[in-house]
Amino acid sequence: MTPSIPVVVAGALGRMGAEVIKAVVGSADCMLVGAIDNTPGKEGSDIGLELGLGELEVAVTADFEGCLCAVSQSVRDAEAGAVLVDFTHPSVVYEHTRAAIAYGVHPVIGTTGLSPEQLSDLCQFAAKASIGGAVIPNFSVGMVLLQQAAAAAARFYDHAELTELHHNCKADAPSGTCIKTAELMEELGKSFNPAEVDEHESLAGSRGGRRESGLRLHSLRLPGLVAHQEVMFGAPGETYTLRHDTIDRSAYMPGVLLTVRKVRSLQTLVYGLERLI
């Protein structure tokens, strides 16, 4: 029988972290071994009881590195080591990812906000350590399909704008998913949205953020939303719109579990779910 995959979840009491724990506990080949969260008053409580899953005998801890150290020592086979699933905050995601690699724990990063320079540094660090990991801006298979369609459409349209919509507790803007979509559209090296008029914004930022390629990205934050993205292309006489809507966070769990299962066979850090499917 194949041993279960040891999984640590950081941000365990957050919306995404809680969904990940439910998915891990419900899977046949994963085992929850750590729950990291700094919510006041929760240190030492059983994560299963906190989430209504029954007692799991995994205590909530705020000691990130202490948890990774304990897990790395208990999992002796480095090639098939433990996995960290991180849904925390952009302000700590770089340090969390680097610490996981240093402890020989495979990072699966769902937290967005890494800069291109930080991502490059982490890729080099993981390659030197021969530790596989993944930075996934969006775990939805449907979003991967939208991104692929957007990249294909970018060959034929010179005008395009991207809009992402999220709940009002999301800390970063634009979303990592929106940035990733723009990057895929830009791989041809073309420029978008050639100027037709001399634009003037009476309210700064009205036209969204403009990338070097000319693509414009817009971010909306409202209660009631989960995660949504729209890519609109325009040409004389027509528009072409791609849209993906996540209405429940359970939609991400197949992608999370797929990444957890595959990441231990990697020797470096990959960026994007499309690299794994």
UniProtKB/Swiss-Prot annotation:
Its main location: cytoplasm. It is found in: Cytoplasm. (S)-2,3,4,5-tetrahydrodipicolinate binds at residues 167, 176-177. It holds the Pfam family DapB_C. It catalyses: (S)-2,3,4,5-tetrahydrodipicolinate + NAD(+) + H2O = (2S,4S)-4-hydroxy-2,3,4,5-tetrahydrodipicolinate + NADH + H(+); (S)-2,3,4,5-tetrahydrodipicolinate + NADP(+) + H2O = (2S,4S)-4-hydroxy-2,3,4,5-tetrahydrodipicolinate + NADPH + H(+). NAD(+) binds at residues 11-16, 110-112. The active site is at residues 166, 170. GO terms for biological process: diaminopimelate biosynthetic process; lysine biosynthetic process via diaminopimelate. GO terms for molecular function: 4-hydroxy-tetrahydrodipicolinate reductase; NAD binding; NADP binding; oxidoreductase activity, acting on CH or CH2 groups, NAD or NADP as acceptor. The keyword Cytoplasm applies. The keyword Ribosomal protein does not apply. Pathway: Amino-acid biosynthesis; L-lysine biosynthesis via DAP pathway; (S)-tetrahydrodipicolinate from L-aspartate: step 4/4. InterPro entries: DapB_C, DapB_N, DapB_N_CS, DHDPR_bac, NAD(P)-bd_dom_sf. CDD domains: DHDPR_N (cd02274). Its EC number is 1.17.1.8. Keywords: Amino-acid biosynthesis, Cytoplasm, Diaminopimelate biosynthesis, Lysine biosynthesis, NAD, NADP, Oxidoreductase. GO terms for cellular component: cytosol. NCBIfam families: dapB. Belongs to the DapB family. Catalyzes the conversion of 4-hydroxy-tetrahydrodipicolinate (HTPA) to tetrahydrodipicolinate. This is 4-hydroxy-tetrahydrodipicolinate reductase. It comes from Parasynechococcus marenigrum (strain WH8102). The lineage of its organism: Bacteria, Bacillati, Cyanobacteriota, Cyanophyceae, Synechococcales.
